[in-house]
Amino acid sequence: METAEGPHLVRLYVYDMSRGLARRLSPVMLGKQLEGIWHTSIIVFDEEFFYGREGITSCLPGRTMLGEPDSVMELGITEVTEEIFLEYLSSLGESGFSGESYHLFDHNCNTFSNEVAQFLTGKKIPSYITELPSEVLSTPLGQALRPLLDSVQIQPAGGNIFNRQSGPS
């Protein structure tokens, strides 16, 4: 168990929502190679934090309905305390990361992971993850499917939901 003080390891969990189908089908369907359809979360203080249609949520690492991540990246070390981090998450939930703010292409789990990674470590998550929406939308099929895909909201089942009223539940 991590202590409240001292350096804390920050990791990025990366899940392929397509379970390998994007790698096989994207060249035919989109005319370009995609390695996956990425969902990400931040792991710090022995907790997995992610964002979706319910807002900011947390659970024990690897305990979402997605199971174990496809890859784990060490983003660095943070000196931010757990208390300050939870206050930061609460303020994010009140400002730009409420459930109503979620948008599959423009404001999603990867947007959240990128912002939190920068807060904790000063580093961004890999660009192949954050640039995926523009890669898909740059194709004719991506443009044709955008109205349908705009209605998609992803929320892996987790545990605690952060919101204005009560913080972690």
Curated annotation (Swiss-Prot):
Catalytic activity as recorded in UniProt: S-hexadecanoyl-L-cysteinyl-[protein] + H2O = L-cysteinyl-[protein] + hexadecanoate + H(+)
Residue numbers covered by motif Nuclear export signal 2: 140-154
Protein keywords: Cytoplasm, Hydrolase, Nucleus, Protease
GO BP field: protein export from nucleus; protein modification by small protein removal; proteolysis; regulation of proteasomal ubiquitin-dependent protein catabolic process
Nuclear export signal 1 (motif): residue ranges: 84-92
Gene Ontology molecular function, alphabetical: long-chain fatty acyl-CoA hydrolase activity; palmitoyl-(protein) hydrolase activity; peptidase activity
Principal subcellular localization: cytoplasm
Active site (UniProt): 39, 109
GO (cellular component) term, any one: nucleus
Pfam families: Peptidase_C97 (PF05903)
Uppermost EC category: hydrolase
EC numbers: 3.4.-.-, 3.1.2.22
Signal peptide start and end residues: none
Domain spans labelled PPPDE: 8-150
UniProt superkingdom: Eukaryota
Similarity annotation: Belongs to the DeSI family.
Self-association and partners: Homodimer.
The protein's name in its UniProt record: Desumoylating isopeptidase 1
Natural source organism: Xenopus laevis
Taxonomic placement: Eukaryota, Metazoa, Chordata, Craniata, Vertebrata
Gene name tied to this protein: desi1
